Each structure stands twice: as structure tokens, then as C-alpha cells.
From Swiss-Prot:
Keyword hit for Ribonucleoprotein: yes
GO BP annotations, alphabetical order: translation
GO cellular component terms, semicolon-separated: cytosolic large ribosomal subunit
Family: Belongs to the bacterial ribosomal protein bL27 family.
Proregion positions: 1-10
InterPro entries the UniProt entry points to: Ribosomal_bL27, Ribosomal_bL27_CS
Name assigned to this protein: Large ribosomal subunit protein bL27
Length: 92
């Protein structure tokens, strides 16, 4: 009479599981592009930001993504008025 044996082989190495980490976004290069006292041409980007961390002052416009840019050529001046940080462009 023949005996039938059921043999089950187990894995000698565990299967490699996936992780939920391992992603990162590209940096957005936010911040000041020109500093206080520098000369800016009309249309030059002064400050890239999300939200209005710094508000536009004289001769400074705000883009759709809250980027501050010079409306005319001149010297950049960062100032604080009424508890708000502002950036302005003044003629020489």
C-alpha cells in the first residue's frame, strides 16, 4: 500500500513589498529674485510667492500667481507700513 504525502514548500525569502513613500515634488524656486537697493527694469520679477506674504507698493504689480514685478524701471525698496511688508520701486 502506497502512502501519499502532501508536502508544502514555504518561501525561503519574503517577497519584497511596496512602500507608500518615495515621492517628492520639484522645488518651486520661491522667494526674492532682487534685493533691496538693486536696480530693476520694467517687468522684472522682484518676488515669487504663494499668497501675499509681501504686498505690492508703488510701481509694483501683482501677477495671477501673486508674483510681484516692477511696473517701471527704478530702485527696489522693501519697507514695512501698517504692519505689512511692502516692496516699492522708486525712480533714481
Amino acid at each position: 500500500m502506497l502512502l501519499q504525502l502532501q508536502i508544502q514548500l514555504f518561501a525561503s525569502k519574503k517577497g519584497a513589498g511596496s512602500t507608500r513613500n518615495g515621492r517628492d515634488s520639484h522645488s518651486k524656486r520661491l522667494g526674492a529674485k532682487l534685493s533691496d537697493g538693486q536696480f530693476a527694469k520694467a517687468g522684472a520679477i522682484i518676488y515669487r510667492q504663494r499668497g501675499t506674504k509681501i504686498h505690492p507698493g508703488f510701481n509694483v504689480g501683482r501677477g495671477g500667481d501673486d508674483t510681484l514685478f516692477a511696473k517701471m524701471s527704478g530702485i527696489i525698496k522693501f519697507e514695512k507700513k501698517h504692519g505689512r511688508k511692502k516692496v516699492s520701486v522708486y525712480l533714481q
